[in-house]
Amino acid sequence: MPAASPTRAGQAAETQALEYLQGQGLQLLARNWRCKGGELDLVMLDADTVVFVEVRYRLHAGFGGALDSIDGRKQKRLVLAASLFLQKEPHWGNHPCRFDVVALQGSHHAGRPLQWLKNAFEC
């Protein structure tokens, strides 16, 4: 059986992350929200808090693991995209916000534990 494309593997990781977070009580507001500033993988609501979730999947840790792949440049792009989301969806603007990261690593990640970092970085 051929290996899954990186795009498919990333989509599968996002689906796994979404299902996990929904199981933890979060509600989906948007998925793959795109703007000129970038893309938000998942935008969710945790009680009254708008949560911008970056899902990272890495097959190997050779160039750093999934969590290591979120550098300062990526954080700035996420903050910009989140700001644009809140401008386009002003009814969420008065809610507290946070940035979370869900990381999955390894082949056939379905069923493998994932790492959920709440408040992964400050903006």
Curated annotation (Swiss-Prot):
GO MF: nucleic acid binding
InterPro entries: Restrct_endonuc-II-like, tRNA_endonuc-like_dom_sf, UPF0102_YraN-like
Pfam families referenced in this protein's UniProt entry, alphabetically: UPF0102
Family: Belongs to the UPF0102 family.
HAMAP family in UniProt: UPF0102
Stored PANTHER family: UPF0102 PROTEIN YRAN (PTHR34039:SF1)
Identification of the protein by name: UPF0102 protein PputGB1_4524
Protein species of origin: Pseudomonas putida (strain GB-1)
Taxonomic lineage from the root: Bacteria, Pseudomonadati, Pseudomonadota, Gammaproteobacteria, Pseudomonadales
